[in-house]
């Protein structure tokens, strides 16, 4: 299962929710039904979402038969999951972000640096948050400057540390 978004807190008193999309184009989340809500195992189909609208950097959604704030409690604060096969097949050397979470980071000398804990999108480029010796380091996801090689099958990402101002010391 892949996390493609999150249902947040209730919005107002009429059964609306905040919903955050993690897809590259925010609206694409509505192309991948059914959704499974992680904690409650509730399945939501396209016809369950009776209305949605953009609200700042996320969406407000209205789910069928949820008409007040109390009824929202079974839905809130849950990741939205889909099955891997629901995503389009990719070409060679393409990958989804969730594919790199299982990769280990190595430097150019083949020394293991750590594993990816998060991907941060700062609007200009993404940054990998890596756990290294119980501390977090941040690597810009810029190819080929910092990211030299990605091998999803071997679960390896090779990075160049020479431009990172010794943040590993």
Swiss-Prot record:
Cellular component aspect of the GO annotation: cytoplasm; ribosome
Name the UniProt key words of this record, in alphabetical order.
Chaperone, Cytoplasm, Ribosome biogenesis, rRNA processing
Q: What is its main location?
A: cytoplasm
Q: Where in the cell is it found?
A: Cytoplasm
For this chain, one GO molecular function annotation is:
ribosome binding
Q: Which Pfam families match?
A: PRC_RimM, RimM
Keyword Chaperone (UniProt)? yes
**One GO BP annotation of this record:** ribosomal small subunit biogenesis
According to the entry, every stretch annotated as the PRC barrel domain falls at 92-166
Going by the entry's taxonomy, the superkingdom of the source organism is recorded as Bacteria
Cite the record's note on assembly: Binds ribosomal protein uS19.
Q: What does this protein do?
A: An accessory protein needed during the final step in the assembly of 30S ribosomal subunit, possibly for assembly of the head region. Essential for efficient processing of 16S rRNA. May be needed both before and after RbfA during the maturation of 16S rRNA. It has affinity for free ribosomal 30S subunits but not for 70S ribosomes.
* Written domain comment of the UniProt record: The PRC barrel domain binds ribosomal protein uS19.
Q: Which family is this protein grouped under?
A: Belongs to the RimM family.
Q: Tell me what this protein is called.
A: Ribosome maturation factor RimM
Protein source organism = Buchnera aphidicola subsp. Cinara cedri (strain Cc)
